[in-house]
Amino acid sequence: MNECKLSEINWTKAAVFAGGDRGHYRTDFDCFVGVDRGSLWILEEELALALAVGDFDSVTVEERQLIQERAQHFVQAQPEKDDTDLELALLTIFEKNPQAQVTIFGALGGRIDHMLANVFLPSNPKLAPYMRQIEIEDGQNLISYCPEGTNQLKPRSDYNYLAFMPVRDSQLTIIGAKYELTEANFFFKKVYASNEYIDLSLIHI
């Protein structure tokens, strides 16, 4: 294992590779973190594996040994634990840099229970304070999180559509999108889908 101190790694902009769909990823990050089989994905793409976290039940003994040898830091998690491997990876990153910006790849698709656990990461009270710093990305979707209260969303030129999913039964307002939602026309849905950006203007929710 090419071990270094976790404090020596630049955690400012981190990519986390989970063990799901491998169809999409980017490399414009300061460091790469593998979660279980996602660690092998990083090595196969010839990227530097800063941190490998997991119980590694989805890899062979030989693959686990390779991950341990190549990772700068290796964390073997117990199979029985309160937090998922992905949650443990995120908590490690935010422990080292509370301002880190994290993009997660390979978190969608596959087992529905795993995917839903990933989508609702900020429901973990230990991760909730960092929700604005977490994004989940695949080739078609970008999931970001907003805390309760007033928030601004900056449009991205590579996405045309957006949707909103309030976690609680709150009265959501949407200002600046094609289909606005205000007190005057409010109706409750669990998912407000198929909205659109307008001229890359800020959206207020």
PLM region descriptions:
Residues 1-66:
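N-terminal beta-strand-loop-alpha-helix module at the start
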Residues 37-44, 89-90, 118-124:
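Histidine-anchored nucleotide/phosphate-binding helix
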Residues 74-97:
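Short phosphate-binding loop-to-helix
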Residues 103-148:
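Anionic-ligand-binding alpha/beta catalytic cores of soluble enzymes and soluble regulatory domains
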Residues 143-182:
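Beta-strand/loop-alpha-helix module characteristic of Rossmann-like adenine-cofactor folds
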Residues 173-200:
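A conserved acidic, glycine/proline-rich C-terminal tail/linker
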Residues 203-205:
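Conserved small/polar residues in nucleotide/adenosyl-binding loops
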